[in-house]
Structures are given as structure tokens and as C-alpha cells.
């Protein structure tokens, strides 16, 4: 088991990786991908959506390629959509959900950094598409939603 420490002006995060029991990723993923990406997955899968946003944003703000930047923006916005749902702001959640969908569409691929984007987006739509059914989602009763669980595919992708 390995610990991760992410430090920035806004974020200090230290916890052991691979602590989760659902095996969202492998040791090969830990070795291949940025620690902020893996940390964000742990946090997201734990329902810590704002903290997942912080971890992914730490990576996004660094020097990354254009595809990775777009992917991280989509992941950040999807996490923020669930954060807004948690705090009772469906209008803001809808805005973040729409932005995430746009970013995923611009990526133009079905797998990125071992995440099956088609599956993730299908789960995202199942959880949040109801937000698009009203002119003002604040007027709708909030259903019980389940955020997608992120589980990386076994193959390691080359990313920019």
C-alpha cells in the first residue's frame, strides 16, 4: 500500500491508496497514472465529490496535454454536479452535468486513462438526465440518485 500527499494552496490530502474494497483500479494503474487521478477516483467512489474535484483539479492546473485536460475537466464537472446534488442545488448540478457531457463529447473516444467513457456516461445519464426534463430543475422533486462507480479497465492507456 502506498500513501499519497497532494499539496496546494487549497488542498492538503494524505491517505493510503488501494484501501477500498471494490478494486476500482490495480497496482498497474497506480504505477501508470498520475497520483491525483487515482486519488480523485478513491474520493469520488467514497462520495467525497468536492474532494475528488480538488484532486483532479490539482492535476488539471499543471502541465498536461490537451486531451487529458479536457478529460479532467469533464471528470471535475461530473464530480461537482454530484456535489451540488448533495447540497440541494439541482440547478447548478444541471449546469455542471451539461458541461461534463459537452467535454466528454469533445474527447471523441470511448476509453481514456482506462476509464470506459461510454459506460461512465451511461451511468451519469441514468443518475442525472432527469435534471434536463424541466425548465427549472428546482421545481422537480429530487429523486434518490446513485453516482457512477469508477472502475478502471485492466488495459493501461497511453495519454497525452
Set out the residue ranges of the language-model regions.
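TPR/TPR-like (Sel1-like) alpha-helical repeat modules
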Residues: 90-108
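Residue-level signature for tetratricopeptide repeat
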Residues: 42-43, 76, 83
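A hydrophobic membrane-anchoring alpha-helix module
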Residues: 127, 131-160
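Alpha-helical segment of the N-proximal tetratricopeptide repeat
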Residues: 35-51
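Boundary/linker segments of alpha-helical solenoid repeat arrays
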Residues: 67-69, 103-117
